Amino acid sequence: MIKFSRRRLAKLANAQIDDRIDYKNVDLLRQFLTEEGKILPRRVTGLTAKQQRGMTRAIKQARIMALLEFIHR
């Protein structure tokens, strides 16, 4: 028997998405990283595909700008 998971609402659905997802907003970006520093997948975060792409870009930019670490030890 196949079990279907219930659709989740995006965590950032009610907020202004474009304003909040930014490489300078380090506190928000850290919520979407594991303890090892890996980016959490969409099925865990509950973001839409567009939001996840923006989040990934922002995290990668923050890493390049040295606002986030590449590896957490």
Swiss-Prot record:
Location, primary (coarse class): plastid
Keywords recorded for this protein, A-Z: Chloroplast, Plastid, Ribonucleoprotein, Ribosomal protein, RNA-binding, rRNA-binding
InterPro entries documented for this protein: Ribosomal_bS18, Ribosomal_bS18_CS, Ribosomal_bS18_sf
GO molecular function annotation: small ribosomal subunit rRNA binding; structural constituent of ribosome
Location in the cell: Plastid, Chloroplast
GO biological process: translation
Domain of life: Eukaryota
UniProt GO cellular component terms: chloroplast; mitochondrial small ribosomal subunit
Assembly notes: Part of the 30S ribosomal subunit.
Protein family according to the UniProt entry: Belongs to the bacterial ribosomal protein bS18 family.
Matching PANTHER family: 30S RIBOSOMAL PROTEIN S18, SMALL RIBOSOMAL SUBUNIT PROTEIN BS18M
HAMAP family: Ribosomal_bS18
Protein name listed in UniProt: Small ribosomal subunit protein bS18c
The gene coding this protein: rps18
